[in-house]
């Protein structure tokens, strides 16, 4: 069982890193702590994983719950993303010769940082190219509600990107 679990973690660690960066992008130590807490919670829950949903769906659900629960416990209202980290992340995602794309991604990361926890979670899943059905499985929302929320978040991001802070 342990070997199977470790293989799954190794295969899907990028998923956990995305959640950690979304919720703790301003503090490397807090990201490491959150990563460890998520892996520990995944390990505790692993015996109950029955394969009725994809492993990634199950892992996202647990990872997001751990991150959001920690924020509520610590009463962290928002996560401030440092501009340097956002630009660095954008450069890693962008083609090396695409400075405009890099700046656009940095602006997008900064706008996402201004969203509330639930909105960050939904947009993270959406940007990871998950279907509305998969997002619904992870969040417990209906597929229609996911679509409505994603569209509202897109509108909010558009406003933040073109008109500044809300």
Where are the language model's segments positioned?
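DNA-recognition helix of helix-turn-helix
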Residues: 68, 139-164
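A short, charge-rich alpha-helical start-of-domain segment used by transcription regulators
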Residues: 1-22, 29-32, 43
